Design a protein with these regions (language model features):
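Tubulin/FtsZ superfamily GTPase core signature
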Residues: 1-371
Length: 371
């Protein structure tokens, strides 16, 4: 008798360095399903705090478990020294996410090594990383750009989130911790927005082959997330997704687009059509647009749209100038382009099957409390 085959795509999320491991911890905390989590770090103490399925301390001889000292060369060498161990934990994956906060040591230097191994094993390899805040200094910025360039060469698709864009989200009174929490939620939404397309049954289903057709060898990519309620909710959610202040580049000219629309059982066909048309018009005329829709009654009257745009001419999207923070229009309180962070007085609602997300935050050393 032929043994049963596992037809589910094997998805692994690798967080490397302090920022990457923090991102993985956040995904575990909210209950992201259908993936295996791997935490890699040169800081043995910080690694002990992770709840990842697999924890790998690299550079044991090189750093003695004390971290890379914000030196990407140390991070790279540490990962290279444990290349066989990294390969072993990545074996069998169909898709590998590599996430880190660019600009430091372990993540910046080690992420390209991890991506290189994953891609050689035949996995669709997607990088989701952050560019550091300007206040973190010139050296960190320079290291981040070099790390991003190197990681782009090793990934099928690379999504970069600039932390400075968090400052354009509107509220000048937001606390430092809430800003970082928002960034964690965006990163979560980025990874989950892709994995849900594969792992969550939908009204219009997508599978791993659909995602791969857009993201394999696509180079730089953009992701947008939007949600809205009310009469024009689907179109407003789509508009929010393609014009998110977290996107520093325009999706004009994208030749590959993944589009996911989620709503309650009252989600209408014409709503879906109007939202999809809006996204289609923003992409390249000959774009390969892969579309999925899911019914999730937990969303109530809310519609959520996730857009991933890739495959740009020249390999990178066109630059979009930053816009100053705008005051919230109190007459239109239903539209949002970023995930909402629950207030301390309000317990977080259970994570719905179709929530979307996207960003890893590079926490400054003075906020790490020695971790």
């Amino acid at each position: 008798m032929t043994p049963p085959h596992n037809y589910l795509a094997v998805i692994k999320v690798v967080g490397i360095g302090g920022g990457g491991v923090n991102a993985v911890n956040r995904m575990i905390e909210v209950g992201l399903k259908g993936v295996e989590f791997i935490a890699i770090n040169t800081d043995a103490q910080a690694l002990l705090m992770s709840d990842a399925d697999v924890k790998l301390d690299v550079g044991r001889e090189l750093t003695r478990g004390l971290g890379a000292g914000a030196n990407p060369d140390v991070g790279k060498n540490a990962a290279e020294d444990h290349r066989d161990e990294i390969e072993e934990v990545l074996k069998g994956a169909d898709m590998v996410f590599v996430t880190c906060g660019e600009g430091g040591g372990t993540g910046t230097g080690g992420a390209p090594v991890v991506a290189n191994i994953a891609r050689k094993l035949g996995a669709l390899t997607i990088g989701v990383v952050t560019r550091p805040f300007s206040f973190e200094g010139k050296r960190r910025q320079v290291q981040a750009e070099a790390g991003i360039d190197e990681l782009r060469n090793q990934c099928d698709t690379l999504i970069v989130i600039p932390n400075d864009r968090l400052l354009a989200l509107g509220d000048r009174n937001i606390s430092m911790m809430d800003a970082f929490r928002t960034a964690d939620q965006v990163l979560l939404s980025g990874v989950q927005g892709i994995t849900d397309l594969i792992t969550t049954p939908g009204l219009i289903n997508l599978d791993f082959a659909d995602v791969k057709s857009v993201m394999s060898g696509a180079g730089s990519a953009l992701m947008g997330i939007g949600s809205a309620r009310g009469e024009n909710r689907a179109v407003e959610a789509a508009e929010a997704a393609i014009s998110s202040p977290l996107l520093e580049q325009s999706m004009d000219g994208a030749r590959g687009v993944l589009l996911s629309i989620a709503g309650g059982s009252d989600l209408g066909l014409f709503e879906i059509n109007d939202a999809a048309q809006l996204v289609t018009d923003a992409a390249h005329p000959d774009a390969n647009i892969i579309f999925g829709a899911v019914i999730d009654d937990a969303l109530g009257d809310e519609v959520r749209v996730t857009v991933i745009a890739a495959g740009f001419d020249g390999g990178t999207p066109a630059y979009k100038a930053a816009e100053p923070a705008r005051k919230t229009n109190q007459n239109q309180p239903t539209q949002s382009s970023t995930p909402v962070v629950p207030s301390p007085a309000t317990p977080a609602a259970p994570q719905s099957p179709r929530r979307v997300l996207f960003d890893d935050v590079d926490v400054p050393d003075f906020l790490k409390n020695g971790s």
